[in-house]
């Protein structure tokens, strides 16, 4: 099953994920993958996430949390945050494990 590591930018989620899953297929910067698929290619965020989960059932997904903080003025930036949030909700639902990373320390939330 999928494992999701999420945290703020530069909080160490990629290092922790790779340390805990050295042999697994990893997808770092998944928030940027969502940006390309949804905003550039016009895919719907949840549909993209469902397809991804079906195609990569044992993946280690690593993403930045982008939904906290000040709401961007730019509509495209707001759409990006919304798409990432919706897609990661699907991934988290499908995941066997969800770990939130702060200062390099993982806290398992699922």
Regions of interest found by a model, annotated:
Residues 1-22, 26-28:
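Glycine-rich P-loop/Walker A and Walker A-like loops and their local beta1-loop-alpha1 context
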Residues 3-9, 38-40, 76-78:
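Short, flexible loop segments at the rims of nucleotide/cofactor-binding pockets, characterized by
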Residues 4, 16, 39, 73, ...:
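Generic detector of leucine side chains in alpha-helical contexts
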Residues 11, 32-33, 67, 106:
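Short, solvent-exposed loop/turn segments at secondary-structure junctions
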Residues 19-43:
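Conserved substrate/cofactor phosphate-moiety recognition/catalytic segment
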């Amino acid at each position: 099953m999928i494992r999701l590591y999420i945290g703020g930018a530069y909080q160490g989620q990629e290092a922790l994920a790779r340390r805990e899953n050295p042999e697994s297929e990893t997808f770092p910067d998944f928030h940027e993958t969502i940006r390309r698929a949804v905003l550039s290619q016009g895919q719907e965020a949840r549909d993209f996430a469902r397809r991804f989960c079906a195609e990569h059932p044992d993946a280690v997904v690593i993403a930045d949390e982008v939904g906290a903080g000040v709401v961007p003025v730019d509509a495209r930036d707001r759409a990006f945050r919304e798409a990432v949030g919706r897609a990661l909700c699907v991934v988290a639902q499908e995941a066997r494990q969800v770990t939130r990373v702060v200062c390099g320390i993982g806290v398992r939330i699922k």
